[in-house]
Structures are given as structure tokens and as C-alpha cells.
């Protein structure tokens, strides 16, 4: 074994800002932050529902706060952005073949968005 020190290239914390691909990746992954807030709000709401009508009314008042509404809109936008990037990558990662031919990427992406719309409508009708 050699006593030489291996070469370790210096990297700053912001190395990813210089590369558009990595910047896009970091923005995409950062969309989880507003979703964490949204998930915590839902869990607190579920706990409030169990505690009784007074706690539920208090949670509803909290959710009506304009800052909370704005954060929920940011969470929705982040979720839609994350879904769009996932849907656009899916045909590249797992091409779908029917009758020996690969389906067009646009068809696969539109089918996924159609499924999202159908499930959303179904949930809205049920609830």
C-alpha cells in the first residue's frame, strides 16, 4: 500500500447551480418541501377530526388562513410539476409496446394525465 494521499477534487456546496441539468433536478426534488407541510396539515386535521367538533372547527379556521392557503397552492403547483416531470420521463424509462410498435411518448403522457383527471373526478364525485 502506498503512503500517497489520493487526489480529492474540491467541490463547493453550490456546484449544482452551474449545471442546468442538476439545477432542474434539485428544483424538482425541492418540490417535496411544500408537500411535507401539506401532509402534516392533513395529519393534524385527521387528529382534529378524532378529537371532536371544537378541534375540527379550529383546524378549519387554521386551514382558512391566507398563508396556509398560499402554501397549499405552492404544494399543489409543486406536486403538478413533479407529476409532469415524472410522466414525461416514464415513456423513456419504460417504453410501452403494442403490436410490436412503441407507443408515441405524447400518447403515454396524455394517457397518464387523463388517468389523473379521471381519478380526480371520481374522488370529487364520491366525496
UniProtKB/Swiss-Prot annotation:
Anchors the catalytic components of the fumarate reductase complex to the cell membrane, binds quinones. The chain crosses the membrane at residues 30-50, 67-87, 107-127. InterPro entries: Fumarate_red_C, SQR/QFR_C/D. Belongs to the FrdC family. Its main location: membrane. It is found in: Cell inner membrane. The keyword Transmembrane applies. This is Fumarate reductase subunit C. GO terms for cellular component: fumarate reductase complex; plasma membrane. Keywords: Cell inner membrane, Cell membrane, Membrane, Transmembrane, Transmembrane helix. It is a multi-pass membrane protein. Part of an enzyme complex containing four subunits: a flavoprotein (FrdA), an iron-sulfur protein (FrdB), and two hydrophobic anchor proteins (FrdC and FrdD). One of its GO terms (molecular function) is succinate dehydrogenase activity. SUPFAM superfamilies: Fumarate reductase respiratory complex transmembrane subunits.
Amino acid at each position: 500500500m502506498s503512503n500517497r494521499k489520493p487526489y480529492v477534487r474540491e467541490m463547493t456546496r453550490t456546484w449544482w447551480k452551474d449545471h442546468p441539468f442538476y439545477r432542474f433536478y434539485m428544483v424538482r426534488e425541492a418540490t417535496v418541501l411544500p408537500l411535507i407541510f401539506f401532509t402534516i396539515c392533513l395529519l393534524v386535521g385527521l387528529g382534529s377530526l378524532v378529537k371532536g367538533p371544537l378541534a375540527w372547527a379550529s383546524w378549519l379556521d387554521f386551514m382558512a388562513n391566507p398563508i396556509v392557503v398560499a402554501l397549499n397552492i405552492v404544494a399543489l403547483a409543486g406536486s403538478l410539476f413533479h407529476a409532469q416531470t415524472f410522466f414525461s420521463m416514464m415513456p423513456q424509462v419504460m417504453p410501452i409496446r403494442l403490436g410490436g410498435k412503441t407507443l408515441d411518448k405524447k400518447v403515454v403522457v396524455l394517457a397518464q394525465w387523463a388517468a389523473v383527471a379521471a381519478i380526480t373526478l371520481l374522488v370529487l364525485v364520491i366525496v
